[in-house]
């Protein structure tokens, strides 16, 4: 039966979005000291290769931070540690003052309020934009609830609010598979926003986008900062310059430099690492 494939797809996605499981209760986030993420002396090795080398990084509450660095600098491994995909050999990782990320599973970390957007968008192409957001909604709405229960007015308002924020209100009834690459990226960001994360990790959001989509993505990410913290890993330096107040440069698993884009560009050590590549 044709209906079975979409249902199976929804169930599989429900396993990915474990945060919709109402049996999980998120620990309370404490950012009273103004910092949402603490990474201290994090080291990770894979078969003798040190992907992270005593990495220390702090992200402020409401901050938009850009992370740059050459291939192999440790950017992906850093995000893997934050989201629980990789356990470090040494170091500590705290979400706010009290939530020890190294003691939590991946689903528990998502439930605590950390959302991650990978480079390639993952959406339900056979379902509408509205349905994609509905499935991702935080709270007691698993797959079967979505299939057989009606949304409340408050839930519809929440979806409409996110649709407006990501600029897809006019495509709410369109199949996700019909969207452009950039629109799919915005939809997946919207799906994460339905879970109301306090910290959003975004990996190369403008790769493959048109100039117009890139500009719109910059506007979207800037609009998200303040209410939540946003960490963007990106290779497009023009895009980084358009959104970043603070840039962190990673090299060989450690922080090489940190500051404004101008400060980073004029840093002698950074210029040596990039060997003349344009920043």
What is the predicted function of each stretch?
Residues 1-43, 278-279:
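ABC-family P-loop ATPase nucleotide-binding domain
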Residues 214-226:
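Helical segment within the ABC ATPase nucleotide-binding domain
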Residues 21, 27, 146-171, 198, ...:
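Conserved ABC ATPase "signature" region
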Residues 83:
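Helix-to-loop junction immediately C-terminal to a conserved catalytic motif
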Residues 68-70:
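The feature captures the beta-strand-to-loop junction immediately N-terminal to the Walker
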Residues 92-111:
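ABC ATPase NBD Q-loop/coupling interface
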Residues 200-204:
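Catalytic Walker B motif of ABC-type/P-loop ATPase nucleotide-binding domains
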């Amino acid at each position: 039966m044709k209906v079975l494939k979409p249902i199976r797809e929804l169930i599989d996605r429900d396993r990915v979005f474990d945060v919709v499981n109402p049996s999980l209760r998120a620990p309370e986030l404490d950012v009273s000291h103004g910092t949402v993420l603490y990474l201290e002396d994090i080291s990770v090795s894979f078969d003798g290769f040190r992907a992270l080398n005593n990495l220390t990084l702090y992200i402020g509450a409401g901050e938009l931070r850009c992370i740059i660095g050459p291939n192999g600098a440790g950017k992906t491994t850093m995000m893997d540690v934050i989201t629980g995909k990789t356990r470090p050999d040494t170091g500590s990782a705290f979400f706010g003052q009290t939530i020890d990320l190294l003691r939590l599973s991946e689903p528990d970390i998502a439930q605590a309020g950390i959302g991650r957007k990978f480079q390639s968008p993952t959406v339900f192409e056979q379902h509408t934009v509205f349905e994609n957001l509905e499935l991702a909604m935080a709270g007691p709405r698993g797959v079967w609830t979505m299939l057989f229960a009606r949304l409340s007015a408050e839930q519809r308002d929440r979806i409409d609010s996110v649709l407006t924020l990501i600029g897809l209100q006019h495509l709410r009834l369109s199949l996700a598979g019909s969207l452009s690459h950039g629109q799919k990226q915005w939809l997946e960001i919207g799906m994460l926003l339905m879970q109301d994360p306090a910290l959003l990790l975004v990996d190369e959001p403008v790769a493959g986008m048109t100039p117009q989509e890139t500009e719109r993505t910059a506007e979207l990410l800037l609009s998200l900062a303040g209410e939540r913290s946003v960490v963007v890993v990106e290779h497009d330096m023009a895009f980084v310059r358009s959104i970043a107040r603070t840039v962190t440069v990673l090299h060989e698993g450690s922080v090489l430099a940190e500051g404004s884009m101008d400060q980073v560009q004029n840093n002698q050590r950074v210029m040596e690492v990039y060997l003349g590549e344009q920043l």
